[in-house]
């Protein structure tokens, strides 16, 4: 929600200020959430000490209600100390060598695959995303895609492409069952392509004449595109739908602007995607350091914003840079509960797959809750659940139980009547 997002503006940077103003107008960001302050510019890197000063200044001015931040500058994009963190992760966690360091295991994010909708309140974490647009015109186009996505419930295709680049295709086991698992999801078709037997040369040195062995082309309804290549060809031949998420597993996708000779994550935005992700230093191919498609897709279709879905999909995000329009929310549908005659009617699309939900009843003056009904959720989709109420002339209280925000395996109170 706009009230939960703080926009970080590089004071004196005309492009950052113009982009921030455009975003504020498009998303109705409260003025109190516009954080303008001097930011060291002219370099893609900010040192650990200078970043600590910057972060302290930001934290001191953030409203207590802010749950996430948007970065409107493009320099700096990473924080350099003993190792490098993406600035979006450094803003969320603070700079720490436990969050980066080449091929080593890095710190786990408590936000990964959680059900928290208020990460700062629940976990002390403010996820951050860099808009990633180099010009005002590019930013306006990206913002417009995000706004157009809201509530659109698009019909489109998600592409999961395993290439002959084995080192960069290590995420494919997560993709194998997704087309079947989502086969009945309204409007969504997931396609897994195994091109691992293609020429290794075509994967490592793709050209403009590449074919399905290395990339998709001439697709008109791309909602998701996840692959593993140093550089992804033929992006411009595809049409990305508003709200589309896309990324490629490679070492330096977040190392802006040049990605050390690889393709930067911002190329996805230039091609029409609404958000992407890349790492700012060599992470090696730990799958935990990159988005997990099964998690991202589920949270997104449950009604999460794009910043929530992307952040929840990365288990070890310290070396990562998240780029795009954070508030895009194609499948927004707030849960509703109403009394209809002698029944409670619950409507939602945000139920967690394979999780238990329960409605309890307690008579007025009573102390014990009694379960009225229990259900196990399936795929994220609109669900209407009608729960008969007890014929108690005195009436009573109702409560809605489901996965805890930070420990989804446990049941917590999600809502309760007065």
Explain the meaning of each model-derived region.
Residues 1-345, 351-356, 366:
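Cysteine-dependent hydrolase recognition
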Residues 332-418:
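Low-complexity, Ser/Thr/Pro-rich intrinsically disordered linker/stalk segments at domain junctions
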């Amino acid at each position: 929600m706009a009230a939960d997002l703080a926009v970080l503006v590089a004071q004196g940077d005309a492009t950052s200020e113009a982009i921030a103003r455009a975003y504020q107008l498009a998303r109705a960001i409260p003025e109190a959430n516009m954080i303008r302050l001097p930011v060291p510019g002219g370099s893609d890197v900010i040192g650990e000490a200078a970043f600590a000063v910057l972060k302290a200044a930001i934290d001191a001015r953030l409203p207590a209600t802010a749950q996430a931040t948007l970065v409107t500058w493009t320099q700096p994009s990473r924080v350099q100390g003993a190792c490098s963190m993406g600035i979006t992760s450094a803003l969320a966690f603070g700079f720490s060598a436990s969050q980066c360091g080449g091929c080593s295991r890095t710190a786990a994010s408590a936000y990964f695959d959680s059900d928290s909708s208020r990460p700062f309140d629940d976990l002390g974490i403010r996820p951050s995303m860099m808009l990633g647009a180099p010009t005002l015109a590019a930013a306006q186009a990206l913002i417009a895609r995000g706004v157009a996505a809201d509530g659109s419930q698009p019909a489109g295709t998600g592409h999961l492409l395993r290439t002959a680049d084995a080192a960069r295709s290590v995420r494919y086991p997560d993709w194998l069952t997704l087309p079947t698992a989502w086969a009945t999801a309204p409007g969504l078709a997931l396609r897994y392509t195994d091109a691992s037997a293609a020429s290794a040369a075509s994967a490592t040195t793709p050209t403009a004449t590449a074919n399905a062995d290395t990339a998709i082309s001439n697709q008109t309804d791309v909602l998701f595109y996840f692959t593993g290549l140093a550089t992804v060809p033929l992006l411009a031949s595809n049409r990305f739908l508003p709200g589309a998420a896309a990324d490629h597993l490679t070492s330096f996708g977040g190392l802006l602007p040049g990605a050390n000779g690889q393709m930067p994550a911002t190329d996805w935005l230039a091609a029409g995607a609404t958000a992407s992700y890349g790492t700012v230093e060599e992470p090696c191919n730990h799958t935990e350091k990159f988005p997990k498609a099964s998690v991202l897709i589920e949270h997104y279709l449950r009604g999460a914003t794009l910043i929530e879905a992307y952040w929840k999909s990365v288990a070890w995000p310290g070396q990562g840079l998240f780029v795009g329009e954070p508030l895009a929310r194609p499948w927004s549908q707030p849960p509703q509960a109403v009394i209809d005659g002698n029944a409670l009617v619950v409507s939602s699309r945000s139920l967690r797959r394979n999780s238990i939900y329960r409605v309890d009843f307690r008579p007025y003056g009573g102390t014990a809750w009694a379960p009225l009904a229990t259900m196990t959720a399936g795929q994220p989709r609109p669900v209407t659940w009608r729960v008969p109420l007890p014929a108690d002339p005195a009436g009573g209280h109702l409560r809605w139980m489901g996965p805890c925000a930070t420990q989804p395996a446990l049941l917590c109170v999600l809502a309760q009547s007065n």
